[in-house]
Amino acid sequence: MEKKCPCYVEGKNTEKRMDMSKALFITGTGTDIGKTYVTGLIVKKLAEEGKSAAYYKAAMSGNDRRADGSLIPGDALFVQKISGITQPLEEMCPYVYEHAYSPHLASRIEGHPVEMAVVRDGYRAVCDKYDYVTVE
């Protein structure tokens, strides 16, 4: 039985369907407990087995700036390095914040609120491009 993509919105996208087993959601009960590390290892293992694997995180906070002032998505960069994947950082996370608060608070402070449509569209694009997507 086919299942609709978890980001499917009736009337908002085509009838494209996705096997739900292609996405793996990594969660934890706190910060600094190893979610990103474990996610990186999962992506690495998938890639080593010849799978087209990707990483997606809707928002991340506590990021450093490059010399040009742009923000570096730290968790995405870490996963990219530990796993060896070449997925562009820009498609890994649509919302990157500097302040080291929860993303919802950092988004308010920085005046760049998270829009669910942007998160869904980014996730959908990654799902369309890769065989396996890990979501943190």
What are these regions (language model features)?
Residues I26-T39:
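Glycine-rich phosphate-binding P-loop
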Residues C5-C7:
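Cysteine-centered motifs
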Residues S102-V135:
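Phosphate-binding/switch loop-helix module in NTP-utilizing enzymes
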Residues Y37-G111:
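N-terminal phosphate/diphosphate-binding loop that engages ATP/GTP or pyrophosphate donors
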Residues T27, K57, E136:
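Short beta-strand segments
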Residues D19-F25:
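Extreme N-terminal starter segment of soluble prokaryotic enzymes
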